[in-house]
Amino acid sequence: MVVEKRNPIPVKEAIQRIVNQQSSMPAITVALEKSLNHILAEDIVATYDIPRFDKSPYDGFAIRSVDSQGASGQNRIEFKVIDHIGAGSVSDKLVGDHEAVRIMTGAQIPNGADAVVMFEQTIELEDTFTIRKPFSKNENISLKGEETKTGDVVLKKGQVINPGAIAVLATYGYAEVKVIKQPSVAVIATGSELLDVNDVLEDGKIRNSNGPMICALAEKLGLEVGIYKTQKDDLDSGIQVVKEAMEKHDIVITTGGVSVGDFDYLPEIYKAVKAEVLFNKVAMRPGSVTTVAFADGKYLFGLSGNPSACFTGFELFVKPAVKHMCGALEVFPQIIKATLMEDFTKANPFTRFIRAKATLTSAGATVVPSGFNKSGAVVAIAHANCMVMLPGGSRGFKAGHTVDIILTESDAAEEELLL
C-alpha cells in the first residue's frame, strides 16, 4: 500500500475548510416542545408589545403621583383604597384624588394611576394607608413595550433554540416552529483489534470505546445516530459499509484507519466513494491524522482510533460541520481564558489540546489538567469538562499562566456561584 503524502495545516484553517463547503439541511416545522437545540430557520418578530400594558412589578398600591408630592416623615399623606386586583385582573375604577388600588405583581395599572407604592413603603390601616415620601410619574411601573415593541426581531435566524428561546416562542404563541433539520450521523468503528462491549477480552484486543463515545456526543447535540457493526481492517468491506452509510446519512464518522500503517485503508475508501479530501493532517496533538472529506453535500470524518484524539476531533471538527449544515450563526468553537493551576511541562511543536477540569468562579476561570494525557487515554476524558489549547512552539506552561480553553461540558461552575 502506497503511503499518502500528508501536509499538516493549522486547526483554524482545517475548520475553515469544513465550513466553506456548500452543505445545508432543509427547513422543517416541529412542535415547540420538540424544538430544543434546533436552529431557527427564520427570524422571529414580536407580534405585540411586551409588556402589552403598563403593569406593576411589585405588590403595592397604584396611586396618582401628584397626590404624593410633599410627603415626608413629618408630613405623612393618606390614601383611600378603592379596589383590589391581582395579576390577570383589570380594575374598572378610575383612581381619583388621594385614592389608590391595592395591586399585585403583574397586574395592569388602573386608569388614573401613574405610580406604584410598594407595601413596605406604607403604613396600612383598614381601608387606608399613609406614605412618607413623594413618588414620580411612572415610578415602580413596567411600561408598555419597554422590553420589546411590535416588529422587533426577538430571535434571529441561525440562533440555537435554548430554554430561554422556547419561553420567547411560547410568549408569542408559536405552537410550531420553523427550524433547520438536524443531520443524521453514521458511526463506524474500524479495527481488527476491536471487541464489542459485551465480548470477553482476548490477548491483543481492546473493547470498542470510540463508537459508543461518538454516538453519545452526537446524541448530545440532538442528532439522529445510526450505529454500524464494528468493521475489521478489510478494504472491500470498508468501502461497502461507507457507501451504505452515505446513502442513509448526512454525516459519516469512522474511527480508526486514518494513520499510515499497513492496515489503514481510509484514503482508499475515500477514493472509492469519489470524495474530495479537505485535509488529512492537522498541526495539532492529539489527532494530527484526522482526515475530513466531502462528497455530494455530505461530510466524511476519519477520526483517530485513539480515544482522546477521537474525542478532540469530534469537538473541533464535527461540531462546526453540524452547526454549518444547520445555518448556525456561530460555528467555530468558543474560547475563554483561564488560569492554569498546575505546571504542564511537555514541549509543544504543534498546537496541543489537553483534557482538563475547569472551574468558573467569581474571580474568573481556573483549569487543571485531567490526569493521564496521552492520545490513547480513556479515563481522563470522563473527568474533563474542557480542553486546554496550548499553542505550538511552546516549551510548556507554568502554573499561573493564562491559557485558552474550550468548554465541552456545562458543569464548570463552583458551588459558591450558586449561593
Model-predicted segments: where are they?
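Solvent-exposed alpha-helices and their adjacent loops that cap or buttress functional pockets
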Residues: 54-56, 71-74, 92-96, 109-111, ...
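Structural signal for hydrophobic packing residues in well-ordered secondary-structure cores
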Residues: 19-26, 43, 109, 155-158, ...
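Short, low-complexity N-terminal leaders and the immediately following helix N-cap/first helix
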Residues: 1-75, 328-355, 416-419
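Flexible glycine/proline-rich
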Residues: 28-33, 42, 88, 148, ...
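Helix-rich terminal scaffold detector
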Residues: 3-11, 175-303, 307-313
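Short, glycine/charged-enriched hinge/interface segments at domain edges or termini
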Residues: 2-5, 9-11, 17, 61-232, ...
